[in-house]
Amino acid sequence: MLLSKYFLPVLKEEPSEAQVTSHKLMLRSGMIRQQAAGIYTWLPLGLKVLKNIENIVRLNMNKAGALEVLMPCIQPAHLWMESGRFDNYGKEMLKFQDRHDNTLLFGPTNEDMITDIFRHNIKSYKDLPKNLYHIQWKFRDEIRPRFGVMRGREFLMKDAYSFDINEENAVKTYNQMYKAYINAFRDLGVFAIPVIADNGPIGGNLSHEFHIIAETGESTIYYDKKFKILKDNPDIDVEEIKSWYAAAEEKYEVNKLPISEQEITSSKGIEVGHIFYIGSKYSVNMNALINDEYGKLTPIEMSSYGIGISRLVAAIIEANCDEKGIIWPSSVAPFKVSLINLNIHDSKCVELAEMAYKELSDKNIEVLYDDTEARPGSKFATHDLIGSPHQIIIGPKKAANNIVELKDRKSGVIEDIEVGSLMSVL
């Protein structure tokens, strides 16, 4: 992509309305623009990151055997009345009437609707297990939306729902999805800790939250110090990770620790995922029954699994930034490479830049080629801000000798590379 053709409205000044780093950087780098309190337009750069995260999550759900569906944003209120949850959300749930005076709502979650879909289409234990997921925009009318997309009113979620014949099978499915979540966060390039948590209004009696460690996190989590090795050793077996202690603040009890208090550390975390074993709460309330192997009608066992796709964008930034801007993990970066031509009027610079651009594009490496008239200092600031993992810098002096500079955004290390070796080094 040529920067001269791209829509990248970067801000030089720090936006006064932003309180946390991720919100400031998302506005400054031209990823989002606010349309109303807690509601944002995703501009091209931000949308690329959002789609990259969405695709990685989708891939891991598919690997876990979940099947993608797409439920509507707008839901009939009678389903929520039937499940007994209509009044639980209060003013957070946006309700309205259509022209026929039917009460509708903008769904904050989908347990009620997926249970309705299940009960009308699955009747026998032979059709189990089933695991359905969708990726859809949600709305909760927060009293005080803040921190940009971290706590907005409109947000993108991946929600999955599993259905099993009994508790034993439901817990097996839950554990499979736990592993899928660990793998998804690994693939996203983030350090997420699974902690024992409350189920909240969703219901149930088994629950884990997944937290990214960040100083701006709103939750305090307590966890075994072993988790710190996950940062440098992401390939540790999931079964081993499951044996390590970690708990949300409301579940942390010093006198009931399975390990010594000295082995525990605490941090602020941003919740980016939550999984629940719900049991038969919804199936009983909504009469979602199936015939078991003895021909007896029995309520289905359910679990619910959520990942905040749009929140993850902000959380990843909070954990991967410096004073210059964002440092994207390669897996979610909008562009893997920023190609910076420092002098677009120098024929050798143009020759090397266009050669590199073609080679990168031919290898399907997403590259943003800065072919603008901007001054070198401005170009450096822009590309440090948007956070491409690698920068190829082409200036007249070194270009004359077929040399370009390759900068690693995270470490800041710059090395001279002969242009013919560029692809192999990358």
Curated annotation (Swiss-Prot):
Question: What catalytic reaction does the record list?
Answer: tRNA(Pro) + L-proline + ATP = L-prolyl-tRNA(Pro) + AMP + diphosphate
* Pfam families per UniProt: HGTP_anticodon (PF03129), tRNA-synt_2b (PF00587)
Under InterPro entries, the record lists:
aa-tRNA-synt_IIb, aa-tRNA-synth_II, aa-tRNA-synth_II/BPL/LPL, Anticodon-bd, Anticodon-bd_dom_sf, Pro-tRNA-ligase_IIa, Pro-tRNA-synth_IIa_bac-type, Pro-tRNA_synthetase
Where does this chain mainly localize? cytoplasm
Q: Which HAMAP family match?
A: Pro_tRNA_synth_type2 (MF_01570)
Tell where it localizes. Answer: Cytoplasm
GO CC term, one of those recorded: cytosol
Keywords from the UniProt entry: Aminoacyl-tRNA synthetase, ATP-binding, Cytoplasm, Ligase, Nucleotide-binding, Protein biosynthesis
Q: How does it assemble?
A: Homodimer.
**One Gene Ontology molecular-function label:** ATP binding
Which protein family is it in? Belongs to the class-II aminoacyl-tRNA synthetase family. ProS type 2 subfamily.
Its biological purpose is as follows: Catalyzes the attachment of proline to tRNA(Pro) in a two-step reaction: proline is first activated by ATP to form Pro-AMP and then transferred to the acceptor end of tRNA(Pro).
Q: What is its EC number?
A: 6.1.1.15
Which gene is annotated as encoding this protein in its UniProt record? proS
A GO biological process held by the record: prolyl-tRNA aminoacylation
Q: At the top level of its lineage, which domain of life is listed?
A: Bacteria
Q: What is this protein called?
A: Proline--tRNA ligase
